[in-house]
Structure formats: C-alpha cells, structure tokens
Amino acid sequence: MLKRISCILLCVLMLACTLVLASCNGGEDDSKAQVSVDGDTAGFLPESKHWGGETVNILTYAKDSYTFSDAEIDPEELIDEPVNDAFYERNALILEKYGIDIVGCFPESGEDYIAMLRNDMTSGLNEYDVICASIAYVAPLATEGLLYDFNDIGNGYIHTEKEWWDQTLVRDTAINGNIYFISGDAIVLDDEATWAIFFNKDLVSTYNLDDPYQIVRDGNWNFDTMHELIQKVDLMHGSTKSYDPAVGDQWGMVVQSYDFLLFMQGAGQTLVDNTGETPKFRIDDQRNIQVFTKFTNMVYDEQNVGIADRMGYWADMYVNEGKIFENGNALFMPNSISIVNGEGLRNAEIHYGLLPMPKADELQDEYTTSVNVYRYPVFAIPTSNVTKLDATCYALEAMAYYGKQLVTEEYYDRTLTYKRFQDDDSREMLDLIFRNRSYDLGTIFNFNNGGGDGSLYFYTKLIGQLSTDIVSTYEAQKDNYNAGLSEFIEQCYAE
C-alpha cells in the first residue's frame, strides 16, 4: 500500500511539473500527452465532485492474461512504458481530482472471474463494483437480470452517447432498448481484440502488386480485388503446396476457421438481425447467401489459400499459419490487432502493414470489422452494487474521458503506428478499422438449445467439405439456434 501511495503522489507531482514546463516552454510541442490536473475538463461531467477517497473495485482478467490486461485497469507503478504509464497517470488524476481510487481485482491465472462475481453476489459480500471482461462470458449475466441497464441508472454520471464510448457497441448490443455493456477509451484491449488483415509489404514489392493502401482509399478493397492479389503470390517447391513453414512455399493468404465469421461480418453480414422489435436469424437471407458464395470463391482457392484447420491438428496448424506469415511466405493473414505484441511478429524480419476487412463487393458502402468475442472486454455493473453505484458510474465516465485524452494517442502512435507498423499509412488504416466496428448477438450469445454447437460456429461446419451450401447447413441447425434465441427473447423481451 505504501508503494502504491508513494507512486500516486509521485505521479501527481509529475503532472503538476508538466503544467509548469508547458507554460515555461511557451507551448512547444511534446510527444508525450500533457495532463492538466486543474483544467482540460471541458466536455466531462458538468458536476465536478470529490468522492473523498472512495474505492471502486473492478473485477477483470488475471494480470498475465493479455498485454495491458493489468495496466488498463490498475497499473502498479510507472515503468517507462508509454501505455502503462498513461493509464497510471489517468488513474492518479482521477484519484487526485475526484477522490476515486480505481482498484483492480485480478483473479489468479485460470480462475473463473464470472464464477467469482456470481459467488460475490450470492454471498452478499458485494466486493466487486464493476466487471471488465470478455463480452461472451459477461453477456449471459444480462439475461439473468444480474446487470444494470445503463439507460435506467439515472444518476446522470454516465453518458453512453459520448464519443469516448463505442457507439456501435451500444447500438448493436442493445437488448429491448437496454444497454448492459459498454466499452471504449477507458481501455485498449477492445482495440487489441479487433480483427484486421495483415499484409506483407515485401511480397507486394516482389510481385509488383497494386498498393493495398490505395485500393482501400479508393473504396475498391473487396473479395474480388483481394482474390486477384492472392492469386499472384504462388511459390511451390514440390508437387503440392506445403503448410510446413520450413519448406518455404508461398501462399496468397493463410487463414483459420474463426476468420470465416469475421470475413462475413466485415462484409456486413451478421448472423442475427437486431434492428427489429426482436432479434432474428438472417443466415438464409438472400444477401447473406450471395456474399458467402462470393467469399468462398476466394477462400476455397486451395492452390493459393491455406486453411489451417484442413492441414492437420488445428492447434499445431494455427502455429504454422503464424510462422508462414512471419517467415515472409504469405501475402495476407487475418488476425486480431493484438498479435503485433506477440514475440513472433516482433522478431519477424519482414515489413508488414494493416488493412481493414474487405468489403463484399461494390454494393457495400463502408468498411467494417468485428472482434473476437472471447477476448473483447466490456464494462458491466452488477445489480449487487447499490451503495457505490454513483461513484462507480462517475469513475467509469472519468476513465473513458481521460483515457481518450491521455491513453488513446499513446496506444495508437507509440505502441501501434510507430513501434509496431512504422508507417503513417497504418495509422490511417487503424482509424478506419476502429471507427466502424460491428457486433452480432449471434456470436456474443452463441445461441443454441444447450445440447450442441451454437450459432457462433455455424461457418466452421462448412469448412470440412469446402461447402457453399449455406441453406441446407442452416436448415439442419435452425431448430437448435432458434431454441436458444427464443429463450433469450423470453428472458429479455417479456412484457
């Protein structure tokens, strides 16, 4: 505790010094985000309030789960790492200015944080004021009535319509008009869990390909254009293309089964339509069928596209997939943004860039992308939080507001753009990717009857046979999926 208090005092002193230096430097530019403890609050809550040292306990991932999983909630100290230190400064500012101490509650590795929250609620201990964890695991709590609807809290301390909260998450995951999950600039793991296309710049040069960045800017980045580029990268050392990284065969693209779902979502095709009075499956919608047919025309090109799941034991082949790209032998590889922090890409001797997921075709207006629901974190407040509800909402709003001011640029510029991608084009692509995500209730809730694979795994069922028969595959699963959806509607949409 003494170490924690000392570090916070040190950080507050540093913030004060930053103000003095800023005035002495006559406004000279500084690459590190500058913080004003007494000012720069325009746009934050009109009622500035001091909470007298109130603690807000946030249950989240184990510290070693992901890069930044400890730093984004409650970093222990300043460690000369830009993102960690920006989060630390944010929390110190909130404590000094508003009297709220953000305390991370980190499970041990392998410990079930959802079970911890349930036990906390049923025991009456009420230790956890908010949970920040993967949406796929948090979501069922909403159907059980264990989470607050942010629309219904009514204390005026949290504003889900503000730009520091992910507006498409609010839109796409509204359940009967209720908002149970929020995410945004309070954290960075939401961005880390976002899907994109990694591409090899060296192969673009070697094969004299059109500039992928310009294709995106021109609005022409779609399945057909991507397939044309994929077909131009083809090197084989034997009679058949090898998925062994040591062989050195070159692929236009390497993928795995989960990518199918993310390609379809990037093409604007969700499993569930959540725009009507109640959600409904749209897998057999004619547009969805057309887009999947176009997608499989590209991804089932076995000469140029290597699907890891078809090459052997999936876990081993997923490793091979990554190594093929890292070795410089694949033009494209879809994956989450988080892999830039992994040892493989950090040590890879290739020049790579980043692109949004491709559109389906010219009929699609905007680029969009989605996330890995097993890693995408959201904030939710358990209904057991009564006495500290106001302080919790105030803290979350402050975390997001000051996260946008202090952390987002550090994460974008220092960690992603220049430390990992090292070009201005990738920053442009990151802006494009992050500003237009979409979310699908069919993946988040994985609807099923409790006895089989859920809707999240629909496209996986087609891979084994390289099938394009979406209609009959859906017919075989329709009752299973709709049983889960019907139960969901009964729980959440009953009058």
Feature map (PLM): residue ranges:
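Conserved N-terminal structural module of periplasmic/extracytoplasmic solute-binding proteins
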Residues: L2-C11, A16-E144, L406, G464-E495
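Hinge/lid segment of periplasmic solute-binding proteins
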Residues: D38-E54, Y61, E108-E111, A136-W195
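Extracytoplasmic/periplasmic solute-binding protein
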Residues: L59-A62, L125-I131, I135, I175-I197, ...
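Short helices/loops that flank or line small-molecule/ion binding pockets
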Residues: I114-E127, V138-E144, H227-K232, D316-L331, ...
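Short, solvent-exposed loop/beta-turn-alpha elements that line the ligand-binding surface or hinge
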Residues: D152-W164, V216, D244, Q269-Q290, ...
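Glycine-centered hinge/linker elements that transmit conformational signals in sensory
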Residues: H227-I230, T270-A315
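Extracytoplasmic/periplasmic substrate-recognition and gating elements
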Residues: L345-L416
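Conserved C-terminal helix/tail region of periplasmic/extracytoplasmic solute-binding proteins
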Residues: T383-C393, G403-E495
